[in-house]
Amino acid sequence: MESSRVRLLPLLGAALLLMLPLLGTRAQEDAELQPRALDIYSAVDDASHEKELIEALQEVLKKLKSKRVPIYEKKYGQVPMCDAGEQCAVRKGARIGKLCDCPRGTSCNSFLLKCL
């Protein structure tokens, strides 16, 4: 039993010696990657990128404000009127949500989701 331990010990030592160079190259790769990552995200680009994002968000907010349904329509459960041929519903899986009421003489087609 002791002879097997004596044989196993040098084998483990040799395996460890073979693994050391592999671990060293990985540490070098990590050191090479860190400076490159810092170069990509510089402070100058960050400020201009933030300004672009803020401008884009402001545009989106303006569009959302213009599309809002007036409070009194929400309060009384009314749905806004839409024109003939306009999209009147949205399909989400098996459910269909109503976007607007179709004018007289037309109805919301459940296949095309338009006032026909």
UniProtKB/Swiss-Prot annotation:
Q: Where in the cell is it found?
A: Secreted
Signal peptide positions are 1-27
- This protein's source sits in the domain of life called Eukaryota
Q: Where do the coiled-coil regions begin and end?
A: none
Q: What CDD domains has UniProt attached to this entry?
A: CART_CTD-like
Keywords on this record? Cleavage on pair of basic residues, Disulfide bond, Neuropeptide, Neurotransmitter, Obesity, Phosphoprotein, Secreted, Signal
Modified residue annotations for Phosphotyrosine: 41
Read off the InterPro entries from this record: CART (IPR009106), CART_C_sf (IPR036722)
This entry's comment on induction and repression of expression is: By leptin.
Q: What is its main location?
A: secreted
Disulfide-linked positions: 82-100, 88-108, 102-115
- Which residues, renumbered to this chain, carry the PTM Phosphoserine? 48
GO terms of biological process kind = adult feeding behavior; cell-cell signaling; cellular response to starvation; chemical synaptic transmission; circadian regulation of gene expression; G protein-coupled receptor signaling pathway; intracellular glucose homeostasis; negative regulation of appetite
Record-level Gene Ontology MF annotations? neuropeptide hormone activity
Query: An example Gene Ontology cellular component term from the record?
Result: secretory granule
Q: In which tissues is it expressed?
A: Hypothalamus. Found in neurons of the ventrolateral part of the arcuate nucleus, in the external zone of the median eminence, and also found in terminals in the periventricular part of the paraventricular nucleus.
Concerning its family, UniProt says: Belongs to the CART family.
Functional note:
Satiety factor closely associated with the actions of leptin and neuropeptide Y; this anorectic peptide inhibits both normal and starvation-induced feeding and completely blocks the feeding response induced by neuropeptide Y and regulated by leptin in the hypothalamus. It promotes neuronal development and survival in vitro.
> This chain belongs to which protein, by name?
Cocaine- and amphetamine-regulated transcript protein
